[in-house]
Amino acid sequence: MMLQKLLIFLKENSAKILIKYDGERDIKKYTVRLLYSDIKCRSLGSDTDLPCAILKEIFVENEFVGVEEILDFYNSTISYGIEILKNQFGGGSVISIVIAEKDGAILYTIHIQNTNGTRCLTGVDYIELYENLLLEKI
């Protein structure tokens, strides 16, 4: 149900969520943004060391019902996946996650870049994507 609300929110706002970990930075290692498809709309979010706070700010500002559920999803799934990928590919990696709506489903894109190369996977199952990335070497 919670992801259904997120799906509707993204579709109605023609928006995507970007969560990026940049291990090359010394501070504010995360970027969290709500990106609108309409380039006339300003994106919301910022660079931070506290991604949950920025996510909460974005959803509260947009009067999203179910903010706590989104934060739980971030903490239990997205953040967990980022930590595992950091351990696999190195803390200096850049890991980007884009969450978007496409054809009535939530679509995840995970992009990893480190000194050895880059890798990008897209699909509807976030956990399956990051598990597949763990099997690969870049």
Question: How would you name each of these model-derived features?
Answer:
Residues 1-16, 55, 59-95, 117:
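Negatively charged, low-complexity tracts enriched in Asp/Glu with abundant Ser/Thr
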Residues 48, 79-83, 129-130:
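Generic low-polarity alpha-helical segments
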Residues 50-68, 122-138:
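Repeat-associated, polar segments at repeat-unit boundaries in modular proteins
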Residues 90, 113-115, 138:
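Compositionally biased, intrinsically disordered low-complexity segments enriched
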Residues 21-42, 100-117:
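Short aromatic-glycine-(Arg/Gly/Cys) micro-motifs in beta-strand/loop hairpins
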